[in-house]
Amino acid sequence: ASDVYKRQGKYGIHICHLLQLMLFYGVTTYVVLAVTFDLPFLMEAHHFSSGNSGLMISLFFLAIMAPGFFLGHIVKWMGKHTKFYSLLFIAAGLLLIWISPKEWLIIPGCMLVGLGYGVIQPLIYDETVDTAIPEKTTLALAFVMVMNYLAILLSPFITDFFQTLFHTSSKEFPFIFNLCITLLAMWWEYARKKDSLFGD
């Protein structure tokens, strides 16, 4: 048997690698959900037109979809740093949304977050396929996709918990907090780029 199949163990799935992918996917999904869950409240707090948040969220999802058409070229260009640069896009987008003095500047922020996540999502799915033998790939993908729905389900509760912990009700908090998480993920990816837990 090849080394890949040996690493996949008796269950036909490389459990350690799968868990790492699940964690990474869950964290990145949670981070970008600030755009869909918290953007309308932030815009209202800044006295922007909250009605425009629907358009901005639509552009966010459009940006998620776009990289899929060019993923091969993106990965070829970014190489082993693909996840790092994708996280950088997310961080830049969250920062722009947070500090934006003008309503229209939130649009590129949303799109940067979407583009970063739009690269990470299919990349994670692709790597998940490599963690299992062909007969187990559907099961492995199911476990990874569970993290997407868990992040959606738990995101409001996680944000509320940390807002209570830090005694703040600021509408900017979800973007600041998620930016910090993204920066930590970037540091981890950079520090471990030669032998990253989430290496390409």
Regions from the PLM with identified roles:
Residues 119-132:
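Intracellular juxtamembrane helix-capping segments at the cytosolic ends
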Residues 82-96:
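Structural signature of the two symmetry-related core transmembrane helices
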Residues 134-167:
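A late C-terminal transmembrane helix in Major Facilitator Superfamily
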